């Protein structure tokens, strides 16, 4: 499978899960691989412009969903940006908690974090 460019959207409080996801993709037995295009450091005042350009340059976006997502304005903007740009989006729970969701995500399917789910999403990009 060729590497796909994947933007990872996450609440800053959930950064360790982004690290886990990137690590999973590098594991020898991983059924998927991708190039992490997430924003790892805060942008300057033009961050939305820079972020939109980065999202548009990706094959897909994986959003890590948690109790922190509802208050993660940056993450929600990144997900909304992907929807607006027609970039495929996979929403994925980071754990077993199922908190209230922001309206942007209310009618969306949220996947369980698993290798098969990631492999299917990334393989279909």
Language model features: what each stretch is:
Residues 60-63:
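Inter-motif core of Ras-like GTPase G domains
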Residues 1-57, 87, 94-95:
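Conserved N-terminal substructure of TIR/SEFIR domains
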Residues 113-125:
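C-terminal helix of von Willebrand factor
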Residues 67-85:
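Conserved TIR/SEFIR loop-to-helix hotspot centered on a Trp-containing motif
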Residues 45-48, 76, 115:
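Structural motif corresponding to alpha-helix initiation and N-cap regions
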Residues 17, 72, 98-102:
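Switch/connector loops and helix/strand junctions flanking conserved nucleotide-binding motifs
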Residues 96-111:
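Glycine-rich, charge-decorated loop segments at or immediately adjacent to ligand/cofactor-binding or catalytic sites
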